[in-house]
């Protein structure tokens, strides 16, 4: 709601001090474009933050890819070899 009031206020200022209709039109267009770009930057920052949260678990995905059924028979051999130091 604040952005709407800001745009309307800037439009009022532009109408007050403008020399012609084209100047007013250009000023309003520039302000609206600026607001849109700022909003897009904020949204992209939010999306980047979410992407970082999602990617936090990715380093552990390799654990899920291990074929544990194939490795289980070798575990006692590894434990025995480690105990014979």
From Swiss-Prot:
Organism: Hydra vulgaris
Record's keyword annotation contains Phosphoprotein: no
Expression (tissue specificity): Expressed in entodermal epithelium along the body column.
Protein name: Arminin 6494
Residue stretch(es) of the prosequence: 19-57
Location, primary (coarse class): secreted
Signal peptide extent: 1-18
Keywords annotated in UniProt: Amidation, Antibiotic, Antimicrobial, Immunity, Innate immunity, Membrane, Secreted, Signal, Target cell membrane, Target membrane
PTM annotation (Alanine amide): residues: 82
């Amino acid at each position: 709601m604040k952005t709407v009031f800001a745009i309307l206020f800037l439009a009022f200022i532009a109408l007050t001090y403008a020399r012609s209709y084209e100047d007013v039109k250009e000023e309003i267009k520039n302000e609206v474009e600026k607001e849109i770009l700022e909003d897009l930057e904020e949204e992209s920052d939010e999306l980047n933050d979410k992407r970082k949260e999602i990617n936090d678990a990715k380093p552990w995905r390799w654990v899920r890819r291990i074929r544990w059924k194939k490795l289980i028979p070798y575990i006692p051999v590894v434990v025995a070899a480690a105990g014979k130091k």
